[in-house]
């Protein structure tokens, strides 16, 4: 198996094209929101891009929203959208993620909408038994780019963080993310992808998670 670390949505996309399980790291806040959702009992967590982004990778937020909506229907679950701006009004969040909400409306889904707040998001909504879609200009873009390119689609992409989430403290959140990746990767290998090479916290977190991954698989 191949274990690698990369940066940016383009790097995540390249890893997906190789068939590696891609682990997106966007500490502030997408992957931390995702970990909080997992710890809160979410059934599945996905990422999508907003309508406007400077990233050069192929995007299709409507497709990602449709995928999440179909899973919610299949599992008879509610859908939660965590959107940006993180502290903006729902009206602004719906405008920024217009393609996502249009696709959900087409599927007949009316989601619960919260901000992409990181660990604090669990104070606003109960994630247990829900499907979650996080719309984010960094982690969401990287997740979507990888999902569109991966042979297994969104099933080939996960998230991880080094920040505390739920009841996890210290290195527990990081270890939870790595264990989830190892359990799902099989023989495909894993790529840890810092969502933005311009965000030092993502780059350092990705390197930490990569070293944690190597430590875990070499036991």
PLM features: residue spans?
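N- or domain-start disorder-to-order transition segments that initiate the globular core
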Residues: 1-5
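Short glycine-rich or small-residue beta-strand-to-loop segments that form or flank ligand, phosphate
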Residues: 22-24, 80-85, 191-196
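A short alpha/beta connector and helix-capping loop motif
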Residues: 31-67, 73-85
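Short, ordered loop/turn segments at secondary-structure junctions
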Residues: 50, 86, 116-118, 195-198
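Ordered, amphipathic secondary-structure segments that act as subunit-interaction surfaces
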Residues: 64-117
């Amino acid at each position: 198996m191949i274990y690698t670390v990369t940066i940016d949505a383009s790097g995540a996309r390249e890893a997906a094209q190789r068939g590696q399980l891609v682990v997106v790291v966007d500490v502030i806040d997408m992957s931390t929101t995702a970990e909080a959702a997992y710890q809160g009992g979410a059934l599945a967590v996905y990422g999508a891009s907003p309508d406007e982004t400077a990233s050069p990778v192929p995007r299709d937020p409507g497709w990602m929203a449709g995928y999440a909506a179909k899973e919610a229907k299949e599992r008879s679950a509610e859908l939660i959208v965590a959107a940006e701006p993180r502290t903006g009004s729902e009206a602004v969040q719906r405008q920024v993620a217009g393609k996502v909400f249009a696709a959900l409306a087409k599927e007949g889904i009316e989601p619960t909408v919260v901000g992409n707040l990181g660990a604090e998001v669990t104070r606003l909504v109960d994630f247990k038994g829900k499907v979650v879609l996080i719309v984010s200009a960094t982690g969401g873009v990287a997740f979507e780019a990888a999902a569109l390119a991966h042979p297994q689609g969104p099933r080939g992409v996960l998230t991880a963080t080094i920040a505390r989430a739920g009841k996890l403290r210290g290195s527990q959140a990081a270890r939870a993310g790595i264990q989830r990746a190892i359990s799902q990767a099989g023989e495909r290998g894993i790529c840890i992808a810092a969502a933005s090479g311009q965000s030092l916290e993502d780059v350092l977190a990705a390197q930490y998670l990569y070293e944690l991954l190597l430590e875990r698989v070499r036991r």
